[in-house]
Amino acid sequence: MVNVLVVGDLMIDHYVWGSCDRISPEAPVQVVNIKNETKRLGGLGNVVSNLKTLGSEVGVISVVGDDDVGDEILELLKDRGAKTELIIKEKGRKSSQKSRIMVAHQQVLRLDTESVCEIGVSDDIISKFENILSGYDIVLLSDYGKGVLSPYLTKEIIRITKKSGKMVLIDPKGKDYSKYSGATLLTPNKKEASEALGFGINDEDDLKHALKMLKDKFKLNYSLITLSEDGIALLDEDVKKFPALAKEVFDVTGAGDSVLATLGYCLASKMSLEESIEIANLAAAVVVGKVGSADASWGEIENLKSKKSGFERKIISLDELLRVDRSGKTMVFTNGCFDILHFGHISYLQSAKKIGDMLVVGLNSDRSVKELKGDNRPVNAQSDRASMLAALEFVDFVVIFDEDTPLNLIKTLKPDILVKGADYTGKKVVGSEFVREVKLIDFVDGKSTTNIINKIKG
């Protein structure tokens, strides 16, 4: 069982559902005829709700007002099975509630009731946090700028968590990210990152600069920016994009909470960062297809994943590939840039498939191709190259690697047979010591990406 400790701003998302077919005679405003009202956890509470749906145990540290809304928040948390004994009621504080007037599944007005000021019980929270941290796998901070995560408290939580060797993930707020310095990663969207860094993110160069600046300036372990309809971007050695999967977007409320919760759950479950981002991306796609703050179940995530086209399902991470059932099957591995797919590639891959039962193609990332072939390559981006390879019926899986050689990939995967071109005759093949056998296949004469590029250039 995964145990997640969350800290931040709790609130209630109050929805007033109605219809509208006339304008008020008193003022030029819509008259909404109320049909129904619903209340659910918002802010940090939505992170909790998402975590519980994923199957996590959740401990909650926060501050609410000593009022009816605060009581409702505590009851809703208890109903979700969260641990609420560490939530402090502060006299004079007004608990947060956001009331949204909804007509035809669209917001027409929002009314907020809340206090926006720093809490006065930071030292009490730090003491509680230190006492219970050992019982949790990971820490998530959800900052909505209402005052719970003051600079002092945030810095202390990061310091204590990192000292314990655990990860701390933060959904940030505001323009000053200095209080988040030293966190494992932040999950800002493009607008938030742009405001915090002081420049617009308008193209790929801006995005890479922003990711690098976030990581370096705030001493993060990893740098990530959510891109709304464009998915999620991660800075490794180069920018890696995880495309968005939502087919219809009804309401983006709470999508950031779902990303934070799902990332936290997956990382606490010892999944790799890339696989965790893939799943968080799916969860966000599920959530934006609903109206109001919502969460994504494993069933919904798997259902959306299964709706990816057949060949797209063949493009997987190394972690996913290691879980593929290989019993009784001979795994054949080959690799390359496959920049401009041509008949020579087709013939080579068909021959490789005939050697065994399962053909895995290791594909050089864009960064890797550029390092090997020069600044003008690749011609086609890694996502396009991977999709074209995966669309071939004789290719079973495509896995992208970022190094110059597939040595680490082969060492981890340990395929049965390693296939290379006949030009490797008499040469040592990278990774050969980790496979049962190396097979060399003749290329089709005159067929190469370089020749095609030169022919196009004239």
UniProtKB/Swiss-Prot annotation:
Name one matching Pfam family: CTP_transf_like
Q: Where is this region: Cytidylyltransferase?
A: 333-458
The catalytic activity, as recorded, is:
D-glycero-beta-D-manno-heptose 7-phosphate + ATP = D-glycero-beta-D-manno-heptose 1,7-bisphosphate + ADP + H(+); D-glycero-beta-D-manno-heptose 1-phosphate + ATP + H(+) = ADP-D-glycero-beta-D-manno-heptose + diphosphate
Catalytic site residues? 257
May I have one GO cellular component term? cytosol
Record key words, sorted: ATP-binding, Carbohydrate metabolism, Kinase, Multifunctional enzyme, Nucleotide-binding, Nucleotidyltransferase, Transferase
GO function terms (MF aspect): ATP binding; heptose 7-phosphate kinase activity; heptose-1-phosphate adenylyltransferase activity; phosphotransferase activity, alcohol group as acceptor
Source organism superkingdom: Bacteria
EC assignment: 2.7.1.167, 2.7.7.70
The UniProt similarity line reads: In the N-terminal section; belongs to the carbohydrate kinase PfkB family.
Q: Which NCBIfam families does the entry mention?
A: cyt_tran_rel, rfaE_dom_I, rfaE_dom_II
**What is annotated about its quaternary structure and interactions?**
Homodimer.
Q: What is this protein called?
A: Bifunctional protein HldE
